[in-house]
Amino acid sequence: MNNRLKVLRAERDWSQADLADQLGVSRQTVNALETGRYDPSLPLAFRIASTFGLAIEDIFSE
């Protein structure tokens, strides 16, 4: 699954650790999400969308 996490995070000048703390996941999980090695659960996708103030479909695409 493609996503805009890395771009959105960079726009806010957040490190992977910063985003991980906000989402309640590990930095490794953020890295795996950004590189497409891990697809988020629905609850995590909603937390990500809420964190960035965007709709899920504005962040993730197939």
Language-model regions, residue ranges each:
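DNA major-groove recognition helix of helix-turn-helix/homeodomain DNA-binding modules
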Residues: P43-D58
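A short, Lys/Arg-rich alpha-helix, primarily the initiator
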Residues: M1-E11
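Alpha-helical residues within the helix-turn-helix
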Residues: A10, D21, S50
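Short alpha-helical DNA-recognition segment
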Residues: D13-A32
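DNA major-groove recognition helix of helix-turn-helix
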Residues: E34, F60
